Amino acid sequence: MKIIVGLGNPGIKYAGSRHNTGFSVVTGISDKFDIPFKKKECKAVTGHGMIAGEKVVLAMPQTYMNLSGEAVQELLHFYKCETADLIIIYDDIDLDVGRIRIRKQGSAGGHNGIKSIIGCIGTDEFDRIKVGVGHKPADWDLADYVLSRFPKEELPVMRETVENAVNACEEIIRSGADMAMNKYN
């Protein structure tokens, strides 16, 4: 079983923001594989289904970003899964809009959701898909930037990027992170 967690903030106020790109990707996975979000459990909204012959749980934590680790820890415990069964999908301001990067481990890199997950589960060794949301302009506050929405001219690129991230997640499940990194990084 794989637990696929898209990071974001709950509530309509944050829908479509750069920081909710993880939610956009797991919603794309839900749509592509017909896995509806039906349950509220472990501080997350979840959907259960199959991808490439593997049981999966899709999850969108309903904590705020900086508490995402609580939901991830509860999901791992509830489903008796290891961190090797985890795929985390989130926004990255160090990647250009349109880029994705797959990693098998690494630091939080300033991302509070990843920092929370590493703190709660006690390791940075888990598969992740970082989705580029662009670099913060010098005159912007970081929080304002990540909570902003994409301008119209970036929306087509982001739709394609979300689709690439969905396909990358499928590749991780089907062939492993190394193969997915070779194909998508």
Residue ranges and their predicted role:
Residues 2-105, 115, 119-129, 136-141, ...:
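Nucleotide and nucleotide-moiety/phosphate-recognizing core
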Residues 110-113:
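Hydrophobic alpha-helical segments within soluble ligand-binding/sensing domains
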